[in-house]
Swiss-Prot record:
Reactions catalysed: RNA(n) + a ribonucleoside 5'-triphosphate = RNA(n+1) + diphosphate
EC code: 2.7.7.6
Protein name, as recorded: DNA-directed RNA polymerase subunit alpha
Gene Ontology, cellular component aspect: cytoplasm; DNA-directed RNA polymerase complex
Subunit structure: Homodimer. The RNAP catalytic core consists of 2 alpha, 1 beta, 1 beta' and 1 omega subunit. When a sigma factor is associated with the core the holoenzyme is formed, which can initiate transcription.
Keywords for this protein: DNA-directed RNA polymerase, Nucleotidyltransferase, Transcription, Transferase
GO biological process, one term: DNA-templated transcription
NCBIfam families, sorted: PRK05182.1-2, PRK05182.2-5, rpoA
CDD domains (alphabetical): RNAP_alpha_NTD (cd06928)
Family: Belongs to the RNA polymerase alpha chain family.
Gene Ontology MF terms: DNA binding; DNA-directed RNA polymerase activity; protein dimerization activity
Length: 327
């Protein structure tokens, strides 16, 4: 049978119009009616949420214990310094994290270009202002930069407070290199057909990635996610059968092993309680309803169970186990 996908038009014209080094408009046509909206919305979501980037995640400033401090000789308070640090655009080559050092003395502005960089780390916006130092002031800090995707608040990260040194301030991180994406759908025409669409993507990045390359990466991600649907036969995921947790061997022992009085043992067997696993699932109220089993016998049962680390009223999800018979 002929593949129905071949009956649809595919975009043949792709036009990239650079607005600046970090801003471009990418148009594609023709699309069947409705397909430009479908793909435009999908690409926009992927561009905003799934492009890898780099962001400061931890900061240590000499003489500062928390973000609500102030530094002598520095015009901005620590909160403003941290906000300005988030605006520094960095690109790491061949690594996923790095700790950078920033030291400066003397009056003047502290810029992103003042950060000491190894050979494989690049500052995209070196003129970005981090803070201003007054006469006699200085600043000494370490900044941890990590690779990630999307936006990650401090609470979403796996690092724990007890693993950090005193004075380390964690930052909410916006890793996405894509600052803004919008799309528009316009009318397109091919020969006599006028019911077609043109997709126009307007993309602005922070300079870590070119807009055109961001579109390519987003398209690859979308194709990879959809490829599983292209061949559904023989690709069914095996059902995972959860194994029942093992049963404590003591629960499989008969109640006779508890060495109860004859009266108590007979009362339990009359209620079809043959195993310790049967017994611990009964409550005190249920046992007191048993004929000829009084408070004295109940206390005896509780004491014997307690000596083995067990109590009445326990819940067993996989009881009785398969193949368990009356003793």
């Amino acid at each position: 049978m002929q593949n129905s996908a071949s009956e649809f038009l595919k975009p043949r014209l792709i036009d990239v119009q650079p607005v600046s080094a970090t801003h471009a408009r990418v148009s594609m046509e023709p699309f069947e009616r409705g397909y430009a909206h479908t793909l435009g919305n999908s690409l926009r979501r992927i561009l905003l949420s799934s492009m890898p980037g780099y962001a400061p995640t931890e900061v240590t400033i000499a003489g500062v214990l928390h973000e609500y401090s102030a530094l002598d000789g520095v015009r901005e308070d620590v909160v403003d310094i941290l906000l300005n640090l988030k605006g520094v655009v960095l690109k790491l080559h061949g690594r996923d994290s790095v700790v950078l050092t920033l030291k400066k003395e003397g009056e003047g502005a502290v810029l992103a270009s003042d950060i000491e960089l190894p050979h494989d780390v690049e500052v995209i916006n070196p003129e970005h202002v981090i803070c201003h130092i007054s006469s006699g002031g200085k600043i000494d800090m370490e900044v941890k930069v990590e690779k990630g995707r999307g936006y990650q608040p401090v609470s979403a990260r796996t690092s724990h407070d007890d693993n950090r040194s005193i004075g380390t301030i964690q930052l909410d991180a916006s890793f996405s290199p894509v600052r803004r994406v919008s799309f528009a759908v316009e009318s397109a025409r091919v020969e006599q057909r006028t019911d077609l669409d043109r997709l126009v993507l307007d993309i602005e990045t922070n300079g870590v990635i070119e807009p055109e390359q961001a579109v390519r990466n987003a398209a690859r991600i979308l194709m990879d996610q959809l490829s599983i649907f292209a061949d559904l036969q023989g690709t069914a995921v095996e059902e995972v059968v959860e194994k029942a947790p093992p049963i404590d061997p003591i629960l499989l022992r008969p109640v006779d092993d508890l060495e109860l009085t004859v009266r108590s043992a007979n009362c339990l067997k009359a209620e079809n309680i043959y195993y310790i696993g049967d017994l611990i699932q009964r409550t005190e109220t249920e046992l007191l309803k048993t004929p000829n089993l009084g408070r004295k016998s109940l206390n005896e049962i509780k004491e014997v169970l307690a000596s083995k680390g067990l109590t009445l009223g326990m819940k067993l999800e996989n009881w009785p186990p398969a193949g368990l018979e009356k003793p």
